Design a protein with these regions (language model features):
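Sec/Tat-exported extracytoplasmic proteins
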Residues: 70-78, 93, 162, 166-174
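C-terminal motif of bacterial Sec signal peptides marking the signal peptidase cleavage site
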Residues: 15-19
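Surface-exposed short loop/turn segments
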Residues: 78-125, 136-148
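C-terminal/domain-edge helix-coil "capping" segments
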Residues: 21, 142-191
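N-terminal, post-signal-peptide region of Sec/Tat-exported proteins
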Residues: 56-82
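Bacterial N-terminal signal peptides that target proteins for export
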Residues: 1-8
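Short secondary-structure boundary motifs at beta->alpha junctions and helix caps
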Residues: 48-56, 125-165
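A structural "domain/chain start" motif
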Residues: 20-64, 175-191
Length: 191
């Protein structure tokens, strides 16, 4: 009887966590980006430092995953203001398989991002913006993505989350893309 009780408790906990999971970045509605048009999408991962307990990867795989995710999320906008985005991958952890519910490491990317305006040839952000990007909460990552996902899936998940974070950061600075604070607030209220 206790085994059944434990099993049901585990199922309920998994269901609760799944219900509270974050939205998949690829299923979010298209957001108003004003005059934004993605120019150069530059990702550099040559100096990326692996964290503890990580699967191995290389600069090429990191760069490809992030470039693809940025194109997927921001390449669809066709405004009049060409914006260049430069991303440096500072570090990463691609979770190894662990022991469920005891040691279930999470994946993370550490990024430094800069944004430039093509017309003025000036950097829009005064200081480089640093991001720590974690895997999204979902049923398949509850016990650690190292157990349920291969390296490619982990990289794709992290890269899509990074692209969403960068988009949200740009939207926090509406003047960069020809939006007013009111436009940005109205967009947030509509969602």
């Amino acid at each position: 009887m206790k085994i059944v009780q434990r099993f049901l408790t585990a199922v309920l906990m998994m269901s609760a966590v799944t219900a509270c999971a974050k939205i998949d970045p690829t299923s979010e509605p298209v957001r108003e980006m004003g005059q934004f048009k993605l120019g150069h999408n530059v990702v550099v991962a040559e100096n990326a430092q692996p964290g503890p307990l990580t699967r191995s990867t290389n600069a090429e795989e990191l760069e490809k995953a992030l470039t693809t995710a940025m194109d997927e999320r921001l390449g669809q906008y066709d405004g009049d203001r060409l914006i260049h985005i430069g991303i440096a991958v500072d570090g990463y952890v691609l979770a190894l398989p662990g022991v469920p519910l005891v040691l279930s490491p999470k994946s993370v990317l550490a990024l430094t991002v800069n944004v430039w305006d093509n017309e003025t040839q000036e950097k829009l952000n005064a200081e480089p913006r640093r991001f720590a990007v974690f895997e999204r909460g979902a049923a398949e990552t509850v016990v650690g993505s190292g157990l349920t996902q291969n390296k490619a899936a982990q990289l794709e998940n992290l890269s899509r989350n990074a692209a969403l974070k960068i988009q949200n950061w740009i939207l926090e600075n509406p003047e960069w893309i020809g939006l007013t604070a009111e436009d940005s607030s109205a967009e947030d209220a509509a969602q």
